[in-house]
Regions:
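Catalytic domains of carbohydrate-active enzymes, especially glycoside hydrolases
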Residues: 37-64, 120-122, 126
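Substrate-binding cleft of secreted/luminal carbohydrate-active enzymes
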Residues: 222, 226-228, 232-288
Length: 288
């Protein structure tokens, strides 16, 4: 009986942890180009699907040429602006090798750079930043310590902090952030492209479904709408995920964890991606 009570209490605590800082329900997109410039199709998409958040990649962080220190790379320029009703979430992609050892001032530099970019470009509707990193079990501790430092830097700004979560990272302890954006794409091995779609295949997602319900972090769900074009031995190969496959995976994820339908993100905002799928497909992807 004591063991049973302990198990019940543990389960309740996990549920409370997931609900401690609930995600705001809504629709979002990633913006991953190096110049913020929207055409009429992209603006219409934001309005039609009631997009209230744009996760905008501000810059990457990579190791410098001699491999000693991280440096910013591929910084975005702002030739345009988003509608005032949309919250912009500065997003920074950090290569995993930057987390092979601690860099004590990295968190401070990143936050200061984001704040400076916001001020320079008169970007005011910011309440959160997101860090994207494909951390592994070996780099996890360094990355989580780094996230704690970022949170400390953000405390005076009263910003939230989120991070991307890849499917393989569901087996690890949850990171110290307010919520995670679960990346439900790039799930396969590109070397086996003739057998399965490396962008998204239900068979690659299936083994991770059982880990969803016990993951103790609020999660948004990010789905792919992009195309991957590669040259393989002189042959142009295009990878596009069928709408039916996206929806099959979405339904399976939400059956295992119902709150995954609360906050939906598509990757990424682009005219070609918008035209790749029918409006009814986007309606179903963004259905709560």
């Amino acid at each position: 009986m004591i063991l049973l009570a302990a198990m019940v209490m543990t389960g309740c605590q996990k549920q409370k942890d997931k609900e401690a800082k609930p995600l705001t329900e809504g629709n979002a997109v990633y913006y991953w180009r190096t110049d913020l410039r929207l055409d009429s199709t992209e603006r219409a998409f934001l309005q039609q699907y009631h997009i209230n958040k744009v996760y905008c990649r501000y810059f990457d962080v990579v190791m410098n040429d001699d491999g000693t220190e991280p440096k910013p790379n591929a910084t975005i320029t702002f030739s345009d602006s988003l509608p005032d009703s949309i919250e912009i979430i500065p997003t920074v992609y950090i290569t995993e090798d930057c987390m092979h050892k601690p860099h004590p001032d990295l968190a401070e530099k990143i936050v200061k750079r984001i704040v400076q970019m916001n001020e320079t470009n008169d970007i005011r509707n910011v309440r959160e930043i997101q860090i994207d990193c494909d951390y592994t079990s070996k780099s996890r501790k360094t990355y989580y310590d780094f996230l704690e430092e970022v949170k400390s830097q953000l405390s005076t700004l009263h910003y939230q902090l989120s991070t991307t979560i890849r499917l393989h990272q569901l087996s690890m302890e949850a990171p110290p952030v307010d919520y995670g954006a679960l990346m439900i794409y790039n799930t396969g091995d590109p070397r086996k492209w003739q057998e399965r779609n490396p962008i998204l295949d239900y068979r690659d997602v299936y083994p991770y479904l059982k880990r969803l319900d016990n993951y103790s972090l609020p999660l948004a769900a990010a789905y792919p709408v992009f195309q991957w074009v590669r040259d393989i031995q002189g042959v142009r190969v295009e990878h596009t995920v069928e709408a039916e496959e996206i929806l099959r995976v979405k339904n399976a994820m939400e059956q295992e964890r119902k709150d995954l339908s609360r906050a939906i993100i598509t990757y990424h905002l682009d005219k070609d991606n918008i035209n790749r799928y029918k409006p009814e497909t986007y309606e179903e992807i963004y259905h709560h």
